[in-house]
Amino acid sequence: MSRRSGRLQSRQDNQPLTECISDENNLPMCTRKRKTREQDTTGVSKAEEVQRRRQQFTIENRWVPISESSSIETSLLVPMQTKEPSTPSEELMDTANWVTFRNLFPAHVSDRASPIPLLHWDDLPEVWTIMTRKEALCPRKHDCLKSHPSLGERMRAILLDWLIEVCEVYRLHRESFYLAADFVDRYLAAKENVPKTKLQLIGITSLFVAAKLEEIYPPKLHEFAYVTDGACTDDQILDQELIMLMTLNWDLTPITVNTWLNAFMQICNAEEIANRKTNFHFPSYSSTEFVQVAQLLDVCTLDIGSMDFDYSILAASALYHVTNEEVTLSVTGLKWDDIAACVQWMSTFAMTIREVGVAQLKNFKNIYAGDAHNIQTHCSSLELLDKSHEKQRLLREASCCSPVQVPGVLTPPQSDKKSKKGVL
């Protein structure tokens, strides 16, 4: 080995590991050790910790006086205040684990079994659970008019009946009307001393918001203002829209009575759906029966007494009056005790409709025939409401005048406890 070769060999032997050496093709090759997995994990956790700490503080600019006539600007780190969730959606997102999430809901909700059959293409029991829990998070307030001395039950009925007419004129879906009715009731429950002069503005604004949510081609703003006959302008509707959205905390997707009715009617045909080979299913139920049940719900919604019941109970009770008890309990997952009170309250409305005549399916121009039953129609709902109230009054008078019927055989009192009055 030559003297030069010996020096090169000793140089390569003493070369540190952090330097790069060359192979026979003169390509650099790094010999530095890679970071271990523990080191990488530590680095990521430190970065996350720094980011978490940054989110706990905010920078606040302040002026610090240095003399009587001058001051300098400085910055301070101020801890951020924890914002409480203001809506049910934020409350759900704020939960840390499943146990906390589950404890947000009443215990009776989980006891309600899902009537939806198990199909191979989706986890339908989970859908049912979400629907029941969402309804439990948004209870209805039956005393929504209590804090409004200038408003009455009749005014609310007239407003909702007028909204039904507007929906039929513009070919709006039933879901749009029931969303608007829900917005009106929730808005009145959250406000106080609303004057009767603003009631029409509240109603048309609710329908304006609902149409934008539900309809593919909702009517224009000026069309909603036009149907008020000059009572509401475009600017007033826009201003009221912002007020209403803030009052409702932007919770605009309740499970309406129309949604429950569609679900129950679809479950009635579960066997037919399960036998199909396709994975995509359209709504499959009788349009005529759906319209009859929807007519009963339209009339009942005008009555303030409907606020005493949840939407699912109203839909199940209306289905009971059109079908029978066996079908209703099987497709709703409810028990008779759950719907008994609502069925009894709704009986006068059902009798009135049977006397006057049930609604028939209407066909609309430029509306697909298979979707015609979903278009909101006006069937003299206010007149049916008045007749139902008259029937309720007559039934109350008859029950007060009739003697009390005591079941079983009456047992006479003992001889020593009989009254001596009138004995000769």
UniProtKB/Swiss-Prot annotation:
Disulfide bridge partners, by residue number: none
Biased composition (Polar residues): 7-17
Phosphothreonine found at: T411
The keyword Cell cycle is assigned to this record: yes
BP GO annotations: cell division
A GO CC term attached to the entry: nucleus
Pfam families associated with the record: Cyclin_C (PF02984), Cyclin_N (PF00134)
Compartments (UniProt record): Nucleus
Domain of life: Eukaryota
Region (Disordered): 1-25
Subunit structure: Interacts with a member of the CDK2/CDK protein kinases to form a serine/threonine kinase holoenzyme complex. The cyclin subunit imparts substrate specificity to the complex.
Function: Essential for the control of the cell cycle at the G1/S (start) transition.
Family per record: Belongs to the cyclin family. Cyclin E subfamily.
Protein name listed in UniProt: G1/S-specific cyclin-E
Organism, scientific name: Hemicentrotus pulcherrimus (Sea urchin)
